Swiss-Prot record:
Residues 129-227 bind DNA. It comes from Escherichia coli (strain K12). Pfam families: Response_reg (PF00072), Trans_reg_C (PF00486). Residues 4-120 form the Response regulatory domain. This is Phosphate regulon transcriptional regulatory protein PhoB. It is found in: Cytoplasm. Its main location: cytoplasm. The modification 4-aspartylphosphate is found at D53.
Length: 229
């Protein structure tokens, strides 16, 4: 499954060129021409990365990043700002607000792709790992594809990371706090019950192949991923 990239750019020629370059390099671009349409694209299947212009009809790129960071489902999506605002103070503001990289226009398409790949490697080091398989369930970190046999399964980026952690640490019980630290990281404040929400979503995503039974609740302790039902 190709990595989905949300391209938020109000200038049609630039947006179309960027989308063409992304498609040529194996990505799946999704377009948004203004602030509101970008917000409307924040749903499943979630974008793996967002290319974001600063100046947009209806709002700014900075406002959009703040919106992303407020929501638990989107705060981990990496953002690369692509803008004509090249002053040092603008770059600093963008990065401090939460952008993972900052590219000024005009830009080289090759550099754009290289920077996107660099951000994805930095944010998701699992992307260089091999396919993991357990009882007909397979997870490919490189393509972000999860399969139940030959059937593709759709899930959000947080559920994908949670499943990846479970499949690389099977048959062990983890508390909510441990899962938060391993999957969300220690520098992000998320309530313990957020784990329960994503566990439910992960189970729902695994239902078509019957693999939801592998995500097991251990009362009073936490969760375990097991092939023993």
């Amino acid at each position: 499954m190709a990595r989905r990239i949300l391209v938020v750019e109000d200038e049609a020629p630039i947006r179309e060129m960027v989308c063409f370059v992304l498609e040529q390099n194996g990505f799946q671009p999704v377009e948004a021409e203004d602030y509101d349409s970008a917000v409307n694209q924040l749903n499943e299947p979630w974008p793996d990365l967002i290319l974001l212009d600063w100046m947009l009809p209806g709002g700014s790129g900075i406002q959009f990043i703040k919106h992303l960071k407020r929501e638990s489902m989107t705060r981990d999506i990496p953002v690369v700002m692509l803008t004509a605002r090249g002053e040092e103070e603008d770059r600093v503001r963008g990065l401090e607000t939460g952008a993972d990289d900052y590219i000024t226009k005009p830009f080289s398409p090759k550099e754009l792709v290289a920077r996107i790949k660099a951000v994805m490697r930095r944010i998701s080091p699992m992307a260089v790992e091999e396919v993991i398989e357990m009882q007909g369930l397979s997870l490919d970190p490189t393509s972000h594809r999860v399969m139940a046999g030959e059937e593709p399964l759709e899930m959000g980026p947080t559920e994908f990371k949670l499943l990846h952690f479970f499949m690389t640490h099977p048959e062990r019980v983890y508390s909510r706090e441990q899962l938060l630290n391993h999957v969300w990281g220690t520098n992000v404040y998320v309530e313990d019950r957020t784990v329960d929400v994503h566990i439910r979503r992960l189970r729902k995503a695994l239902e078509p192949g019957g693999h939801d039974r592998m995500v097991q609740t251990v009362r009073g302790t936490g969760y375990r991923f097991s092939t023993r039902f």
